[in-house]
Amino acid sequence: MSSSYNTIALSSTPTFLLSSAAAGPGPNNFNRQEAAMTMVQQQPTSSVAPPPKKRRNQPGNPNPDAEVIALSPKTIMATNRFLCEVCNKGFQREQNLQLHRRGHNLPWKLKQKSNKEVRRKVYLCPEPSCVHHDPARALGDLTGIKKHYYRKHGEKKWKCDKCSKRYAVQSDWKAHSKTCGTKEYRCDCGTIFSRRDSYITHRAFCDALIQESARNPTVSFTAMAAGGGGGARHGFYGGASSALSHNHFGNNPNSGFTPLAAAGYNLNRSSSDKFEDFVPQATNPNPGPTNFLMQCSPNQGLLAQNNQSLMNHHGLISLGDNNNNNHNFFNLAYFQDTKNSDQTGVPSLFTNGADNNGPSALLRGLTSSSSSSVVVNDFGDCDHGNLQGLMNSLAATTDQQGRSPSLFDLHFANNLSMGGSDRLTLDFLGVNGGIVSTVNGRGGRSGGPPLDAEMKFSHPNHPYGKA
């Protein structure tokens, strides 16, 4: 009874002393607080620190008293070091050889454990440039020196069938084969990695690429043109992507694409479908001319890149190669009109339909009320002499190829607005304005003698009056 009472008194003493010390200042408060802190610190501890375990030396840090053994590469790489003198059978361990000698009735003995402390052995790497060739960095295990030599200086003969990794030690290959393919790190882009470090490196690059693409959204205009049959065929060259900027379409009042907007093309769209009308919807297996459609003065900002000097002189329409066939003579799909449609809008810029048989497409396009007036007005700033030189070259090329002279049976309704007469500079075909243009761009003769007959009676001094 008294013992339990003493225990309760001892357990409650610190609390009582602390509360008394906190009650207020007094002559004995400091001594009581110091005694309470001493009792708290003197609580018995039952845990005793265990003695440190003896650990073996780390690889490359041998015991200074160990015996240093240097083996040759041939000895290290030998699979069977211990040979039987009777049958020349080899064994990896001496104990196995001794057990084998029993079968030959030869004296044998196994190593017996002695009470004497055995001196440890360390092994040097035979490669002079290796760090373990130094006795201070020798390896303390015969199997360890063998694996080290195979891994660092030997041939990797073991190959994984799943990931094609090669190993020099068979145990390493077996350990890898058990885990190969079980751990997969899959990136959002679809790439699969078996190693985490490779996955982290790839993921950092992949995320950076996604962020860069999100900050700079661009339209791959070359890819869009290539999807329609090739960029060069439709007139997209090196400077096309820079010329097709937003300033050329919506913000530049002097842009050469003003007639397209007036003809019904919506050029103020979002970036995703801004170039929808300029991408061909159907491919043409026949290669077209390599020049772009139109080119005017440099201040009009058109999409023109020429590689022939003819474009610099004519300024409006680029002639193709003389070896091209009839329907690829001009890259004039801008003025194209289909035979099975009565729509009056301007067709696709780069579509080369099957019904545009050569120069007749130029006639139909230029005489249509929806395209000729707009195009002529827009190109009113071009030099009138360029237009004259253009028509002269057209006639010369046509005469060389033996094509129909009706190509030049043209009549511009807005020629008066350009400061000229009611016809072009020279009536080099003797037509005298005999063309009637319908609304849908289908032109025809309104009467009079055939064109061939008129050309026979044309002015004899005219350079293009002869058939």
UniProtKB/Swiss-Prot annotation:
Annotated stretches, region: Disordered: 38-65, 440-467
Phosphoserine: residues carrying this PTM: 72
Cellular compartments annotated: Plastid, Chloroplast
Any one cellular-component term (Gene Ontology): nucleus
Keywords annotated in UniProt: Chloroplast, DNA-binding, Metal-binding, Phosphoprotein, Plastid, Repeat, Transcription, Transcription regulation, Transit peptide, Zinc, Zinc-finger
Region SHR-binding, residue ranges: 195-207
Biological process annotations from GO: asymmetric cell division; root development
A molecular function GO annotation: transcription cis-regulatory region binding
Tagged with keyword Transferase: no
Residues that hold Zn(2+) 1 according to the record: 160, 163, 176, 180
Start-end of Polar residues biased regions: 39-48
C2H2-type zinc finger span: 82-104, 123-153, 158-181
ZnF segments: CCHC-type: 185-208
Binding site for Zn(2+) 2: 187, 189, 202, 206
Transit peptide (first-last residue): 1-20
Any one Pfam family match given in the protein's UniProt record, by short name: C2CH-3rd_BIRD-IDD
Function: Probable transcription factor.
Protein name per UniProt: Protein indeterminate-domain 6, chloroplastic
Organism field: Arabidopsis thaliana (Mouse-ear cress)
Origin organism lineage: Eukaryota, Viridiplantae, Streptophyta, Embryophyta, Tracheophyta
